[in-house]
Design a protein with these regions (language model features):
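Glycine-rich phosphate/ribose-binding loops and adjacent secondary-structure elements
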Residues: 329-331, 431-439, 443-445, 451-458, ...
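Extended, non-globular alpha-helical segments
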Residues: 393-433, 485-523
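Structural motif
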Residues: 237, 407, 424-426, 445, ...
């Protein structure tokens, strides 16, 4: 019989695939003798079985839960459902990959009306028991029935107003009894039934709810942006309750073995006296820093500090721990590798190597490539900070800087991003429902919550700035306004700027500056470069882009889109004259005017990137994209060409296409108008010769786009070679150049062995290859892809991560066929996928020579390539 339930003592840290991260770590801590409340884990296999069985728990799984519960009763000396000595449990999710705030938790499960009354009488602490009961009802209603927590928070706020108190902790035992009754009434009103009184029914419903939550909207979204497959499922951890809310000698907290914002080696965290764990991360009360525990409970602090160091030594990584103190006794509820900012991730990795705790390769594997994005983006300029007006301060919860219009709901921020509007998400406190809004924002500002609140943890993981706990700001959700300590009012749509490194909130929009990279980052990236096999190039159309990419470690240009050079006003006019020319003579005259611009641009690129190679893609988009749109532009062009406006309208109409993506573009333009390819070749080769004459090594790689037939490539290549060789011969310079093609039409991948006979390199244009393989338009796919994610048809955006099964198969076929006739064939990719870590790893697996990506993604690709090489060599 398959085992679906494991007691903590039966597992270990290597079983995270079936026990989930939390369950595996609870098992490990139990086995090394740490004070962990007893419990058991329902496996990820049980989760997958739940979905296979039509969202029902099988009798097998239920029977194994009963057996484990009986063993837990025996160990604890308490009985589940007993009136005077009840075993209460927490039910928590725990996926294989850490997903903070993504899944759901229920505490104090096992209470009902009779048990609460008898238990309170026995222990003589009515406030504690009914505080626990009302929390249980609220969590059960939220997780199991989908009843919004905010409805219950409103009831609590009404009681606090009636009593004239500010915090939950100031409510007495009678208030807790009243709250419990009000919560039960609210539950019945919403659910249409009384709150369940049978403890085992409560448990089974909670387990099913956690399994269900694996496929809630926010979990699906989080998985998609973090490349977590839905097939992994989540485990459920059922654990004996320990109570941080049993009095002034109890408490709960969250702490890290190092500072998750800076990486500094020092205990960092927060705790609340007389509270339960969810209070700390929910941000409902602002907690005390962990350092004050040293004076409040010195023995507990000493024990905790010792355990924290033991856990870091054991896991060889910074740990994020949850703990509870019950009547002066410390319990560890969880440990996991802590989420951290990008700068902290790099510092911790470098420090652990210097402390001889891990190797350089282990350090490289420790940092998520996507995190580096946060290190590469702008901060506020010193001048703007000096002149900026600070209107409030909160906690520096996630570093970096962000400016934007303030909005108070995640949905508004998401809509603004679609419109290209920079927004800050402002909330009392964030919840898991805000995840997509946070990811769409330039930063997050919360009124409540501490350094380990949901907002802080998730923002750090996403690499966006966050100021939390700005409690001097008054947020009016109905009027959508913020009132600052000085009395100033900011309305929805007004600009604010937040600095997540200092906690300061500024009026208006502050000026930003480029990030500077040095120190630990350079050390860390040098280790990555030692480990990787793939080269990393950049997609750059200007010398400025090329120089930025060089700063980030680019080793050449993998894609220069020549059409982008035509869009400046004086250039576009001459280019339009070329397009609208009706004779070869007119066209060549227009091209002669364009030639100097192109040559000068290429010289700048060659100089910026020397001595590395530069891949220049010849004209690719359909000609109609360059045509004049307004009547003024049309008349101006007609006058210059000596045509009437009507005649020019006819030319424009003749160039219009029904399906331009598959129309007159790419190599088809060079075949129809060979003079375009000649002009571009002259510009490339003459620029290379001019730069070479200055003593700079130049290697141009000329790339013919949209080839689907070897004869197309041969025709254009012959023009290129004839033109280039004539110029080189007359110059007296020994210049080497290469001619290759983009593989972006499925037919090109299928016939790559033929095409390779005429190509010195292949660059896979994964944007168009994905469009043509799926039959999707990248520009229109957003209209329906969300439905695909919601219905489980797609897990990932195929335009962001290579579809390994379809597009990837074509790439593999193209690579193998190409190298079968030309073993020295250079292989690369130049689509948006070149900066996606999973796609980079796929290219490493296929034996590609390089990937090419936008300048700001170069470090991400360098690290992804290093991780891929290390894991491949380890056989993983």
């Amino acid at each position: 019989m398959e085992k679906y339930v494991y007691l903590f003592q039966e597992g270990n840290k290597d079983m995270r695939n079936i026990l989930g991260g939390k369950g595996a770590n609870l098992a490990e801590m139990t086995n090394i003798g740490l004070p962990v409340p007893s419990g058991f884990t329902v496996t990820t296999d049980a989760c997958n079985k739940y979905y296979e069985d039509g969202k029902e728990l099988s009798s097998e799984v239920i029977d194994q839960i009963k057996e484990a519960l009986a063993k837990l009763e025996a160990k604890s000396g308490k009985k589940f459902g007993d009136k005077t000595n009840p075993l209460l449990v927490s039910v928590r999710s725990g996926a294989r990959a850490s997903m903070p705030g993504m899944m759901d938790t229920v505490l104090n499960l096992g209470l009902n009306d009779e048990i609460a009354e008898s238990f309170a009488e026995k222990i003589g602490n009515k406030r504690f028991v009914y505080d626990s009961y009302r929390r249980f009802i609220q969590m059960f209603a939220d997780v199991v029935k989908g009843y919004a927590k905010s409805k219950f928070e409103t009831i609590i706020d009404e009681i606090k107003v009636k009593k004239g108190v500010k915090n939950d902790i100031d409510l007495d035992e009678n208030d807790m009894v009243e709250l419990t009754n009000l919560f039960k009434s609210a539950y019945k009103e919403f659910a249409g039934e009384d709150f369940p009184q049978e403890p085992f029914t409560q448990l089974i419903e909670a387990v099913k709810a956690v399994f269900r939550s694996w496929n809630n909207e926010r979990a699906i979204y989080y998985r998609r942006i973090n490349d977590i497959p839905s097939s992994w499922g989540t485990a459920v951890n059922v654990q004996e309750m320990v109570y941080g809310n049993s009095g002034e000698n109890s408490g709960t907290g969250v702490a890290f073995t190092r500072n998750p914002a800076t990486g500094e080696k020092a205990l960092f965290g927060e705790y609340l006296i007389n509270a339960q764990g969810e209070d700390v991360v929910a941000g409902i009360r602002t907690p005390s820093p962990i350092a004050t525990l040293k004076t409040e409970m010195p023995k507990v602090y000493e024990e905790f500090a010792s355990i924290a160091q033991e856990l870091e030594n054991h896991y060889k990584d910074m740990q994020d721990m949850e703990f509870t103190i019950e009547d002066g006794k410390l319990f560890i509820l969880q440990t996991r590798n802590g989420k951290r900012t990008a700068s902290a991730a790099v510092k911790v990795a470098v420090d652990l190597v210097n402390e001889e705790m891990i190797t350089k390769e282990e350090a490289v594997l420790m940092v998520d490539p996507k995190q580096l994005d946060a290190l590469l983006h702008p901060t506020f300029t010193a001048e703007s900070i000096k002149n900026g007006k600070v209107v409030a301060e909160g906690l520096a919860a996630s570093p970096g800087a962000g400016s934007g219009k303030i909005y108070f709901t995640a949905s508004d921020v998401i809509e603004n991003k679609k419109k290209g509007i920079d927004s800050l998400l402002v909330r009392l406190e964030t919840s898991p429902e805000d995840i997509e809004g946070m990811n769409s924002s330039k930063g997050v500002l919360t009124i409540r919550g501490g350094m380990t609140s949901h907002a802080a943890v998730v923002a750090r993981g996403m690499g966006i700035c966050c100021v939390s706990g700005a409690s001097t700001i008054v947020l009016n959700e109905e009027e959508k306004t913020l009132k600052m300590p000085d009395g100033s009012i900011f309305k929805e749509g007004d600009y604010l700027s937040i600095d997540g490194s200092t906690g300061k909130v500024y009026a208006g929009k502050l000026e930003m500056q480029e990030a500077s990279i040095s120190g630990d980052f350079e050390t860390f990236m040098s280790w990555a470069d030692e480990a990787r096999d793939l080269k990393v190039r950049t997609n750059a159309d200007t010398p400025k882009d090329a120089m930025q990419a060089r700063k980030f470690g680019a080793e050449g240009i993998g894609l220069c889109r020549t059409e982008h050079m035509f869009f400046e006003r004086d250039r576009i006019f001459n280019f339009r004259k070329m397009i609208c020319a009706t004779t070869l003579e007119e066209r060549e005259k227009a091209l002669e005017n364009i030639l100097p611009y192109q040559r000068k641009d290429f010289e700048g690129l060659f100089e910026a990137m020397a001595p590395f190679s530069v891949v220049i893609r010849y004209l690719d988009p359909p000609l109609h994209e360059f045509l004049p749109k307004t009547e003024t532009e049309i008349k101006e062009l007609a006058d210059d060409l000596g045509k009437t406006v009507e005649e020019l309208h006819e030319v424009i109409a003749s160039l219009k296409e029904f399906n331009p993506m598959m129309g007159h573009r790419g190599c088809r333009l060079a075949i129809t108008y060979p003079e375009i390819a000649k002009m571009q070749t002259r510009a490339v080769i003459e620029a290379a010769i001019n730069v070479t004459k200055k003593g700079t090594l130049v290697t141009p790689e000329i790339m013919i786009p949209l080839v689907g037939e070897v004869k197309e490539l041969k025709y254009v290549k012959d023009i290129v070679v004839k033109t280039a060789d004539e110029i080189i011969a007359s110059s007296g310079i020994d210049l080497k150049y290469e001619v290759g093609t983009m593989i972006e039409i499925p037919r090109a991948a299928l016939l790559a062995d033929q095409i390779a006979t005429e190509a010195e390199f292949f660059s896979f244009g994964t944007n168009d290859l994905t469009q043509m393989t799926y039959g999707f338009s990248r520009d229109d796919a957003g209209k329906f892809l969300n439905s695909y994610y919601e219905k489980g048809i797609f897990e990932f955006d195929p335009f962001a991560r290579i579809d390994f099964d379809g597009v990837g198969l074509l790439m593999e076929m193209g690579a193998k066929k190409g190298r079968s006739v030309n073993p020295k064939l250079s292989l690369g990719i130049c689509g948006e996928h070149g900066g996606d870590p999973a796609s980079v790893a796929f290219c490493d697996k296929l034996g590609f020579n390089y990937v090419s990506c936008s300048p700001y993604r170069v470090p991400i690709a360098r690290l992804a390539a290093a991780r891929a090489a290390i894991l491949r060599k380890q056989g993983k």
